Structures are given as C-alpha cells and as structure tokens.
Amino acid sequence: QVTDDVVARASEINKSNELLDLEPDHTKASPRVRRIKRPHLAHEFYRRLSAETCVTDILSELLGPNIRLRAGGKVNMKSAGFGSPVEWHQDWAFYPHTNDDVLAAGILLDDMDLDNGPLLVMPGTHRGPVYDHHSNGAFCGAMDPASVDLDFSKAVPLTGKAGSMTVHHVRLVHGSE
C-alpha cells in the first residue's frame, strides 16, 4: 500500500522530479513510474525496512558485523504491461568508494519471474574491471555492451517471491530487459 500511495503522486506531475523517475510514456491520466528515488524521504516504511534485522543479519554474514547502511537507495519499478529496461552497468560507477566491501541489496515487493523484467546479472564480473560508463566523453550511467568482452547471453535472472532479497557486489555487471 505504501508504494501504491507514493506512485499515485505521479498523477500530479508531467515530468520526473526529485522523488519519481517517470517512464517515457507517462501521462497524468496514465501514470507510469520507473523509479522512486530516495524512498526513505517519501515514507518512513522504506527506512525501517532497510534496517530490519532480517536484512541486516544477512548483510552482516556477508560483510562482517560493522555494516553501515547508505541512506537513500531507490525502488525500481517493473510494473505489469510496461517498464523500461535498465541498461548494463555496474553500481560502482554511480558511487565509488575507497574500499571494495560494498553490496547492493534489493527486496522484492512483488513476485518477480521471467515475465516481468527481472534483474539480470553477469556472474563473476565483480572480480573484473570497472567498465567505462561514458558516451562521447559524458557519464551516461551505462556500459556499451559492444565494447566489453562479455557474453551477455550468459546473464542469470534473479527471480523470487515477494519478500525475497537479492544481494550483489556493486562491481557486478547487471541490467534488466
């Protein structure tokens, strides 16, 4: 219900703002949200969810006991009937850090199967280089698949039931269709 309430705010705007990234075919009459940016500012539920013991326990097992949660995050939407692909990228390009012990965690708010554009990951790429995310000298937030030596047909979809959690290293190459 919380996510539905936040998404309903899209019917009041014509273009993306500091809270919502809209799909290209969005209209006020037919709201289409691609992403809720900084969801912890939209509703307390998101901050509480990311700090739940069931989440932090899993992250602590992977990283050790002294984890820090980064304020912010986002809620990526893959709504039925529409939903833009996310180009191949590494999260590291968006927020580089001074150490390599950084993970991205996702909690599925709905069931995710092959029909609704799951996250696709390239196993083992977190051990490789950080790829270029520029086009014509400007940061574009995506890799050029033709310029890297990766076989994207080997991508693995991350599917699961609502409430499932995905965790990946921020250097792992990933995207969605």
Protein language model regions, located:
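Active-site region of the double-stranded beta-helix
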Residues: 65, 92, 97-98, 107-118, ...
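Histidine-centered catalytic micro-motifs
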Residues: 85-93, 167-176
